[in-house]
Each structure stands twice: as C-alpha cells, then as structure tokens.
Curated annotation (Swiss-Prot):
Name of the protein in its database record: Mediator of RNA polymerase II transcription subunit 7
Job description of the protein: Component of the Mediator complex, a coactivator involved in the regulated transcription of nearly all RNA polymerase II-dependent genes. Mediator functions as a bridge to convey information from gene-specific regulatory proteins to the basal RNA polymerase II transcription machinery. Mediator is recruited to promoters by direct interactions with regulatory proteins and serves as a scaffold for the assembly of a functional preinitiation complex with RNA polymerase II and the general transcription factors.
GO biological process: positive regulation of transcription initiation by RNA polymerase II; regulation of transcription by RNA polymerase II
Cellular-component GO terms for this entry: core mediator complex; euchromatin; mediator complex; nucleus
Coarse class of the protein's main subcellular location: nucleus
Key words of the record: Activator, Nucleus, Transcription, Transcription regulation
Length: 376
C-alpha cells in the first residue's frame, strides 16, 4: 500500500486504487494459466515468471475474488461501515439518557399501564405485537385522542399561568428587579434541568386509587410512545421556563438551552428506533402498489379478451356460405373480363347483386362498429 493511498481514500471522490495498473493483459493471462495448471496439479516453472515472491503474493491476492463479508466492518469512501446495523446508544456519544432502557423484542413490545387521571404508572408488561394490534385498536385510538386533547388543555393552562406569573413579577420597578437578580443565586442546572422521564416516573408512581378508594380505568400504551409523550411535555416545560429566564435574567439562559438540546437529542434517538418499522411498512406499501398494478393489467387483458370474443361471435352470426360467395366472385370476375351486352345481361347482374345486398350491408355495419370502438 502506497503512502498516499490512505489520504486519497478520504476524499469526496477518491481516485481508483493504484493497483489497478497491475491488471494488464499479460498478467491476466499468466494468472489464468497458473490457475489452470494448479487445478490439474501440474508444476510448471515457466507458467508464471514473477520477479520476486512478493509479486507472486500480490498478484494472487489481487486477482482472487474476495468472499462476501458476514460479520465485522468494511470501508467505503474512507468511512467504516458495520454489517450488523446496530444503533449506538446515547451513552456511547456521551449524552445522558432521560429514559430507561426499552426492552422491545422482535415479536413483543413493552407496554405501560397507567392511570390517565393521575398519570400514575401502575406497571409494565410485555405484549405480542399482533395481540396488541387486535386488542380493540379503534377504542385505543379514541382513548389516546381524548388523552392528547386533555394534555393540550393542561399545557395551555400551564402556559397561561406561567405568563401571568411573569407579568405579575415584572410589575415592580426596575430597581427592585435588579436587587432581586443580584441577591438571587445563579440557577443550578440540576435544579432547573430537563425533567427526565425516569424522575417524573418515580414522582408519578403514586397510588392509582382515587379518594373514594375505587380504581379508575387504566390505559395500556407502548412504553416508547409513553416516553415520547413525557419528553415532549418536558420540552414544552423547559421552553416556558426559558421564556421566564429571558424576561428576568437573560444571562442565565445557556443552561436551559443545554437542557432543551439534551431533550431534543433524546426525542430524536427514540424516533430513530422506528426506522426498521418504517422500512418494513414502506416495503409493504411498494409491494401492494405493484400488486395493484399487476391486477389492473390482468383486468385490462380480460376486457380485451371479452371484446375479441364478442366480435368473433358477431362474425359467426353472419353465416357466410363460402361456396355461394365463391360463385359470386367468379361471376363478378367474368363480368369484368367480358363487358355486359344487352338488356338480359344487365338484368342478370342486377339480380345477382340484389341477392347479396343484405349480407353486405350487415357486414359493413359490423365492420363500422368494430372500427369505431377501436378508435374510441
């Protein structure tokens, strides 16, 4: 490997590797002849005449077809790619994870059971994917829509309260605000940090019983969707807190912006876990589209087949007599060769044409219908 080869591989459009110059016609013929001799177990020193042993090894490696990789990594355009397509965790990138590990399998998913009134988590379980899809999907969708609607109302109420608090606190004079800001300690990132789903879960793990002692209706949703909902609410809360900080102490905004960045990275990582599901669904949609196209083509061929059979049936219904038609054609030919003379010959020709007028009219009408239908 030449010293410049490693640098060339990392360019946007790398040039071909330098060993392509070895693929000359002479070397190819030598390698082919050597392979044939090795297959026949014959030793011939004149078959390959390399200069050194290193040239023998290099030619053997270059002209040998590489085997397909089954594991490990490979390089392409200077980047290293993995064959197993494993999604790295946030911890590997040095980013804190705000949710617990989700243990979803190929055929089963982790489900959270919680109380919609108090948002208290009762427990977690595992459910097969097909069983969860069959378990009243319409009712689950309605419950989730109602829950989202109530959550949006709660967010609006919280935002209104926070804005009112900010307005009430900004009413005093500027001097009092400056004194409060100077006397107040800097906001600690841990106190006003991102509201992680794990910490919120511990706070929400309260008793699911109501004041009357009766258990309310519980909802089961996938753990991933539950964590995404919590992270979205935490993101909204941190954004509202950022607005309050910008109104009171703008110099303290970096910690809150960092919290928002961590929340967005966690949301992005959770959403990326749906990529395999998205690829499967996209493949299913493409296959369904191809199937519909093939079915439409088959139906089109069937309609053309029906039209052709109907046309042939109409032709059969005319009931042509080939012997009589042959006689008529011969009489026409003879009349053309020998011009008609006299009133008797003229009457014979008229009677001959009048017999076949009806059949000719029917055939012409049928041909007109067929031509019009084909043109349309």
């Amino acid at each position: 490997m030449e010293p410049n080869e490693g640098v060339q591989l990392f360019s946007a459009f790398p040039p071909p590797p330098p060993y392509y110059k070895l693929f000359t016609r002479e070397n190819i013929e030598k390698v082919i002849s050597n392979m044939e001799k090795e297959a026949k177990h014959e030793d011939d020193a004149n078959t390959l005449q390399p200069k050194t042993e290193e040239e023998i090894e290099s030619l053997a490696k270059l002209f040998k077809k590489p085997s397909c990789l089954t594991s490990g990594t490979y390089q392409m355009f200077g980047d290293t790619w993995r064959l197993d397509e494993a999604i790295p965790s946030l911890k590997e990138f040095g980013i804190p994870e705000l949710y617990k590990d989700i243990k979803d399998g190929e055929d089963e998913i982790e489900v959270v059971e919680y109380d919609p009134k108090s948002n208290a988590i009762v427990g977690t379980s595992f459910t097969r994917v097909h069983d969860y899809d069959k378990n009243s999907p319409i009712e689950n969708e309605k419950i989730l829509e109602d829950d989202q609607h109530t959550a949006m109302k709660e967010k609006d109420n919280e935002s209104d309260k926070t804005m009112k608090d900010v307005e009430e606190k900004t009413e005093p004079s500027l001097k009092k605000e400056e004194e409060d800001i100077q006397m107040k300690e800097p906001l600690d990132s841990q106190d006003t940090g991102a509201v992680s789903a794990s910490s919120v879960n511990e706070g929400f793990r309260a008793d699911q019983k109501s004041k009357d002692g009766e258990t309310s209706d519980l909802i089961k949703i996938p753990r991933r969707a539950y964590e995404l909902r919590f992270l979205s609410r935490s993101l909204m809360l941190n954004f509202l807190e950022l607005l309050g900080i910008m109104a009171k102490a703008p110099e303290q905004f970096p910690s809150k912006v960092e919290n928002i960045r961590v929340l967005l990275l966690n949301l992005h990582h959770l959403i990326n876990d749906y990529r395999p599901h998205q690829s499967r669904e996209s493949l299913i949609m493409l296959l369904e589209k191809q199937l519909k196209h093939e079915e439409s083509q088959v139906e089109l061929l069937r309609t053309h087949n029906r039209q052709m059979t109907e046309t042939l049936e109409k032709y059969k219904s005319l009931d042509f007599n080939m012997e009589k038609e042959g006689d008529v054609i011969q009489q026409l030919k003879s009349s053309i060769k020998k011009p008609l003379s006299g009133a008797e010959d003229e009457q014979k020709s008229r009677s001959m044409f009048s017999k076949n007028d009806e059949k000719l009219k029917k055939s012409l009408e049928l041909m007109e219908d067929v031509i019009k239908r084909d043109l349309s």
